[in-house]
Amino acid sequence: MVGTTLKMRGDENASENFKQVQLKKLTVPSMEATTKRAALGDLQNRGISRPIAAKDAAQKDSKDLKLTDALRNAKARVDSHWKKQPLGSTNGNGNGAVPPKVNEGGVSAFLRSNSVRNRVPTKTTVEPTKVTVKSSSSENVNEPTLKREDSNLSKKSLTKLRAALAKPVMGVSGIRREPVAVSRKEAETKKELPETKKDSLEVKKDATRMPLIRGNSAVTTTTSTMPTTMSLSSKRLAGIEDIDANDKENLVLVSEYVNDIYDYLYQVELEQPIHKDHLAGQKEVSHKMRAVLIDWINEVHLQFHLAAETFQLAVAIIDRYLQVVKDTKRTYLQLVGVTALFIATKYEELFPPAIGDFVFITDDTYTARQIRQMELQIFKAIDCNLSRPLPIHFLRRYSKAAGAEDEHHTMSKYFIELASVDYEMATYRPSEIAAASLFLSLHLLNGNHRAGTGFNDRHWTPTLTFYSRYSAAHLRPITRLIAKLARDAPQAKLKAIYNKYQGSKFQKIALRTELTGALMDSIVGQSQRK
């Protein structure tokens, strides 16, 4: 590469006799051009050891030898034009790094030529940047909103709730149900044996792999993997189907440890029970007020188009709070219910309603501040624990084990919501409610609903017994109570759930003739008729 000579343009007052010595100073030697040229930013970073802030850089003493030596062989990069690369593009070195934000300062701004003074960065200092996502009201997110003209919540429902709260308190008495003790065996640690005893060790391992026997209490887990356990269980227990055999390719279904998950859920529901007659110590709140409150919450739940888990979690929060706080005032019972639903929406929903919507559904009876204060009190009462399993969690597992259709599953959900309003059903575990609801659905939809044959244990197969851990004999009393609630739903005073399941969204389950046939009457029993 031949040395490049910079051409200079003189003005009108410039001297024609330009000195040759000055032209040599503006000429770059050809030998110097062939050498590797350092980047200006890197060169000046090495030359400048400290920033100059107090003193003007143009007035800096020219006897700075380090700066002079560093800039002696520098050549202005006037033959290249730097262009800012878009985000995500690669730089000239091909490393794909994004050019960092640079700050110019110090002596370097005055030591460059005018052609590149405003282009080439000198002393590079990388500043960290934060990426923040701001939510705006113009986003295309269909969040559920509640308008006064579109609301189906009439003042009649609020009047009904207030009338129930204004009635004299009925005494609630009963015996508390003690939680069933949970016993688990600790996993035994395996000791390493010498290589000469490997064969005998493998034989002992095969001999100790026992099937997972499931009863009404918590079970003992094994150290073997689930496919091996299920294959051995299928050999020992005839008629039990491995419902997770075809789910190995679907990682969402976690078939490898799905039974371990349900072992944990069964344990948690025993650790967080709702005792029998849990409102016995309440002075101003009765079981009728609770029923009116939950019926109203179900109506709000339908209005907001919330998930099934949200309603069931709200009911669980209400019962757990009333079980602990025995001095709940009658005037604050609706506040407890709406706050429990507010917590459940934030826990279960992807787009929970705003707190202003919950203020509106109470007809401005409570403020947003009161809801937040009650939220803190509820979390303190339940020890910030929202992990109690719900009936819908077990129902999905049982429906899969039964090979149920959509109508079986929907009818079982209808029975579960009816049971949530009843005070006597609150003491049963969520797994028992789900199993009894499916047991009743199998009777009505798979059997002859016109024949009063009563219970048929053949609907509860060995596979259902294995995965639910309940026998048909254990579920009969619970199923009979649920059947009575379903049969009397059209004549009940609280009809929010009955009206809800008359819609086409729920396959009009509440209008099915199976719910009023002879089979239903035989399951309920003649002695329990009104």
Curated annotation (Swiss-Prot):
GO terms for CC?
chromosome, centromeric region; cyclin-dependent protein kinase holoenzyme complex; cytoplasm; microtubule organizing center; nucleus; spindle midzone
In this chain, where does the modification Phosphoserine occur?
A: 137
What span is annotated as the signal peptide, if there is one? none
Q: Where is this region: Disordered?
A: 76-152
* Cited Gene3D superfamilies: Cyclin-like
> GO:BP terms for this protein?
attachment of spindle microtubules to kinetochore; embryonic development via the syncytial blastoderm; G1/S transition of mitotic cell cycle; G2/M transition of mitotic cell cycle; germ-line cyst formation; midbody abscission; mitotic chromosome movement towards spindle pole; mitotic cytokinesis
Q: Which InterPro entries match?
A: Cyclin (IPR039361), Cyclin-like_dom (IPR013763), Cyclin-like_sf (IPR036915), Cyclin_A/B-like (IPR046965), Cyclin_C-dom (IPR004367), Cyclin_N (IPR006671), Cyclins_cyclin-box (IPR048258)
Molecular-function GO term, any one = cyclin-dependent protein serine/threonine kinase regulator activity
Pfam families noted in UniProt:
Cyclin_C, Cyclin_N
Question: Can the keyword Phosphoprotein be found in this entry's annotation?
Answer: yes
**From start to end residue, where is composition biased (Low complexity)?**
121-144
Q: Which UniProt keywords apply?
A: Cell cycle, Cell division, Cyclin, Mitosis, Phosphoprotein
Question: Its biological function?
Answer: Essential for the control of the cell cycle at the G2/M (mitosis) transition.
Record family assignment: Belongs to the cyclin family. Cyclin AB subfamily.
Protein name as it appears in the record: G2/mitotic-specific cyclin-B
Q: Which organism is it from?
A: Drosophila melanogaster
Upper lineage: Eukaryota, Metazoa, Ecdysozoa, Arthropoda, Hexapoda
